[in-house]
């Protein structure tokens, strides 16, 4: 993918001039843009650092080479920024959204999220996108003038990829698009699909590294087999790690190029000229009709052969029990919570407990579980 070193923003890209601003007004930064400020605040946040020790597919301590939420997030941000540049979109906004998209994830990945949602079913539920928003709006505790990071509207909007209708009704302008059917910015749409490209391909890589899936199994999936053959045609005799890496690299590049071409065509067909046109129209960032079923087949393969592999399911079952046990213990006796969460629990005990658990890393959650439940653990 060859693009210019710098591009002017397209007329339909979000710019500072059309931004809806921050909840708490601030003086403009002197040597950087407003969306750069958002990106920098996210990178320096506590929640961002914790992603290093949160699960992508494999529990953090299972292997040093497997991706964590942090390495996944960095890969998504890199891909998002490259795609944004190719399309003339706001790179800083797109990157900020990508960097923040998983800040609200629980320990133990989707298993932890599902377990915490089950615990919270009578208290408003738990949605990791909403928790990411809650993190940047309230939970980060760094600035004297406000809670959270005080990010621009467009960054916060992009973080909120999914939202149930009851929760959207509580979010005012930020939740309006889930009620009236309008679209987020192209930068937000782009970060969403860059996430999909990254995790689909990199889970292939990690799955092969782990030995839970094999090249022979993956050859049943057209999109993988096609790129593997192309790589081996170019480099006869290539095998092992280099074959896997080159095949995954080829798949990522092809999907990115497909996304760019289809999105450009969609923008042209829709006659989009402004950010308002983007919001009022159909979803524009998309794959081609030929790639969509092939990507679905790859995701289906990963679900059945990696995510549902018995060794992964054993980990996720243990994770659900840890989350459930912690939630139950803290609900029964909130005095077991750290002091700052005891204070919050006085006004909303379930949500304070959910905030505490969601902020844990995999290792911290396991350690906290041992402290509370393991015989002989007293500290």
UniProtKB/Swiss-Prot annotation:
<dbReference type="InterPro" id="IPR003607">
    <property type="entry name" value="HD/PDEase_dom"/>
</dbReference>
<feature type="domain" description="HD">
    <location>
        <begin position="69"/>
        <end position="200"/>
    </location>
</feature>
<dbReference type="Pfam" id="PF13286">
    <property type="entry name" value="HD_assoc"/>
</dbReference>
<comment type="similarity">
    <text>Belongs to the dGTPase family. Type 2 subfamily.</text>
</comment>
<dbReference type="InterPro" id="IPR050135">
    <property type="entry name" value="dGTPase-like"/>
</dbReference>
<dbReference type="InterPro" id="IPR026875">
    <property type="entry name" value="PHydrolase_assoc_dom"/>
</dbReference>
<dbReference type="InterPro" id="IPR006261">
    <property type="entry name" value="dGTPase"/>
</dbReference>
<dbReference type="GO" id="GO:0006203">
    <property type="term" value="P:dGTP catabolic process"/>
</dbReference>
<dbReference type="InterPro" id="IPR023023">
    <property type="entry name" value="dNTPase_2"/>
</dbReference>
<dbReference type="Pfam" id="PF01966">
    <property type="entry name" value="HD"/>
</dbReference>
<dbReference type="GO" id="GO:0008832">
    <property type="term" value="F:dGTPase activity"/>
</dbReference>
<dbReference type="InterPro" id="IPR006674">
    <property type="entry name" value="HD_domain"/>
</dbReference>
<keyword id="KW-0378">Hydrolase</keyword>
<protein>
    <recommendedName>
        <fullName>Deoxyguanosinetriphosphate triphosphohydrolase-like protein</fullName>
    </recommendedName>
</protein>
């Amino acid at each position: 993918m060859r693009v210019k070193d710098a591009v002017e923003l397209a007329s339909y890209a979000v710019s500072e001039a059309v931004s809806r601003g921050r909840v708490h007004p601030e003086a403009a930064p002197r040597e950087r843009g407003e969306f750069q400020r958002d990106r920098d605040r996210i990178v320096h946040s506590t929640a961002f650092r914790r992603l290093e020790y949160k699960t992508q597919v494999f529990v953090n301590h299972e292997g040093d080479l497997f991706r964590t939420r942090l390495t996944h997030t960095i890969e998504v941000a890199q891909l998002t920024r490259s795609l944004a540049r190719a399309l003339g979109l706001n790179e800083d906004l797109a990157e900020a959204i990508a960097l923040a998209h998983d800040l609200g994830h629980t320990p133990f990945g989707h298993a932890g999220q599902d377990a915490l949602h089950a615990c919270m079913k009578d208290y408003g539920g738990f949605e990791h996108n909403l928790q990411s928003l809650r993190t940047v709006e309230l939970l980060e505790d760094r600035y004297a003038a406000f809670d959270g990071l005080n990010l621009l509207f467009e960054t916060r909007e992009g973080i909120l990829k999914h939202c149930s209708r009851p929760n959207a009704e509580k979010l005012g302008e930020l939740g309006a698009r889930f009620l009236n059917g309008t679209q987020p910015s192209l930068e937000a749409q782009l970060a969403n699909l860059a996430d999909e490209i990254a995790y689909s391909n990199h889970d292939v890589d990690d799955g092969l590294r782990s030995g839970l899936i094999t090249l022979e199994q993956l050859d049943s999936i057209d999109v993988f087999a096609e790129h593997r053959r192309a790589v081996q045609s170019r480099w006869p005799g290539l095998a092992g790690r280099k074959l896997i890496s080159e095949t995954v690299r080829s798949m990522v590049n092809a999907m990115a190029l497909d996304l760019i071409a289809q999105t450009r065509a969609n923008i042209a067909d829709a006659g989009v000229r402004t950010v308002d046109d983007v919001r009022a129209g159909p979803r524009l960032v998309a794959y081609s009709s030929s790639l969509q079923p092939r990507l679905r087949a790859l995701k289906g393969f990963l679900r059945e052969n990696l995510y549902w592999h018995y060794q992964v399911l054993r980990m996720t079952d243990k994770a659900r029990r840890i989350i459930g046990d912690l939630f139950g213990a803290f609900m029964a006796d909130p005095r077991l919570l750290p002091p700052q969460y005891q204070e919050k629990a006085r006004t909303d005990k379930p949500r304070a407990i959910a905030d505490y658990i969601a902020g844990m890393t995999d290792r911290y959650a396991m350690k906290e579980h041992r402290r509370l439940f393991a015989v002989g653990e007293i500290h």
